Design a protein with these regions (language model features):
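Catalytic loop of the DD-peptidase/beta-lactamase superfamily, centered on the K-T-G motif
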Residues: 1-124
Length: 124
């Protein structure tokens, strides 16, 4: 979650993947990773990880220059392959995170809801 303990080349690589290159609504897009100012509501997470967000065109706000992540941020990513689906979310400033691995048929919104519930409890 905090790459400061890694060797310099790895720290730089992680920082580059977390750098924000553009925004769509409340979501900032890095290289694969998507982030939100923390704390973030469940509704904003669901909207940013929705089928509509993934499958439809959206107006983007380019971040020029690209922007490092703010101190309070939730970084997340959904994904699936074969018969498996995953959701990863973490909050570096709180030292909390979760990885959910499930059957691909277990919908993204359900993964996100349970992750948000668990992260909210851990943050207390």
């Amino acid at each position: 979650m905090k790459p400061s303990g890694l060797e310099t080349p790895m720290q730089q690589a992680v920082a580059i993947t977390h750098t924000g290159y553009y925004k769509v609504g409340e979501m900032t897009q890095g290289l694969g990773w998507e982030s939100y100012h923390y704390p973030v509501s469940l509704d904003k997470l669901l909207a940013g990880n929705s089928t509509q967000m993934a499958m439809e065109a959206h107006e983007v706000q380019w971040l020029t220059p690209s922007q490092p992540q703010p101190e309070s941020v939730l970084i997340n990513k959904t994904g699936s392959t074969g018969g498996f689906g995953a959701y990863v979310a973490y909050v570096p400033s709180k030292d909390i995170g979760i990885v959910i691995l499930a059957n691909k048929n277990y919908p993204n919104p359900e993964r996100i809801k349970i992750a948000h519930t668990i992260l909210s409890a851990l943050a207390k």
